[in-house]
């Protein structure tokens, strides 16, 4: 099972240990690839539309026409059981790709192109935190799929 997560930017030093923790935990469940793409520009010097357009181009280049699930503030909120069901169903179809927007969100074009949009919360998170939360939910989802205990 291959899963790819496409996200603008990179992981910061203070979140690196959580990032590495979940990457290690997920190894036994899937072949996970995190694809970091360039941020669209300096938010102090470049307009939001230009930044989102630049990030869209980077993301589309990585997608290469594949369908994807978008993590989006305006997406459907689902619980962990629904997420594990989504994970199981998508993996039965083949590979799975998630896209996370950058610091300014995601372009309307990518929003329209997404196969499915889900929200991690009504709260707004940085793209780095969204990545960590997604990795945790992937781990939790695989534990649920495999009928394994998660909380000890």
Curated annotation (Swiss-Prot):
Alphabetized UniProt keyword annotations: Cytoplasm, Methyltransferase, rRNA processing, S-adenosyl-L-methionine, Transferase
CDD domains, alphabetized: RlmH-like
EC number from the UniProt entry: 2.1.1.177
Catalytic function, reaction form: pseudouridine(1915) in 23S rRNA + S-adenosyl-L-methionine = N(3)-methylpseudouridine(1915) in 23S rRNA + S-adenosyl-L-homocysteine + H(+)
Keyword flag Phosphoprotein: no
Chain sites annotated for binding S-adenosyl-L-methionine: 71, 101, 120-125
GO cellular component, one term: cytoplasm
Any one GO molecular-function label of the UniProt entry: rRNA (pseudouridine-N3-)-methyltransferase activity
InterPro entries: Alpha/beta_knot_MTases (IPR029028), RlmH-like (IPR003742), tRNA_m1G_MTases_N (IPR029026)
Catalytic class of the enzyme: transferase
Function text: Specifically methylates the pseudouridine at position 1915 (m3Psi1915) in 23S rRNA.
Protein name: Ribosomal RNA large subunit methyltransferase H
Organism of derivation: Thermosipho melanesiensis (strain DSM 12029 / CIP 104789 / BI429)
Highest classification ranks of the organism: Bacteria, Thermotogati, Thermotogota, Thermotogae, Thermotogales
Gene: rlmH
